[in-house]
Amino acid sequence: MTIGLPRAMLFYRYGALWETFFKELGCDVVISGETSRQTLCDGIKYSIDECCLPSKIYMGHVYSLIGRCDYILVPRVAGYGGKNDVCVKFNALCDIVRNTFETARVLDYNIDIAGGETELRAFLRMGLILGKSAARTLSAYRKARLAQAAEDRRKSELQEKALSRRDGMKILIVSHPYNNYDRLIGRP
């Protein structure tokens, strides 16, 4: 079984988590390519005008995965609890993808801490959908969490190293990871 990961939006925050999780479950993983002008054009074609640029890019990445995998992962995130609500696009993307690409098999998971949908619970549900036991899914999730923590440390160390350099002027750009790390919109 092959799981497609769109290289956009939350991928830049949770890519290591997702890739490790699915590989630990014995799935093949295909990640869409770096964002290109064609990715953006495809995303614009399949989006309404009012969608933000990152959402249009996301749709282009989803389009690029159709026919290349058994499922495309499209997470639904309503909120992390308390004052950690997220932009509505993270709650809506799953429905938008399903309604736009009717032939695509979407694998989703829901996170809504206030509604009792934790990340662990969501991953256990995905494992069941993929026909995996709860024990194997839990083991895969734990390994994936460790991989994501290592990736977070690596990125933090790179940022600290860049900021500690003494040569020349530094300009700090504060943005969402899906803007900063995207090759098309996050680079000069």
How would you name each of these model-derived features?
Residues M1-P188:
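An N-terminal assembly and electron-transfer interface module characteristic of large anaerobic redox
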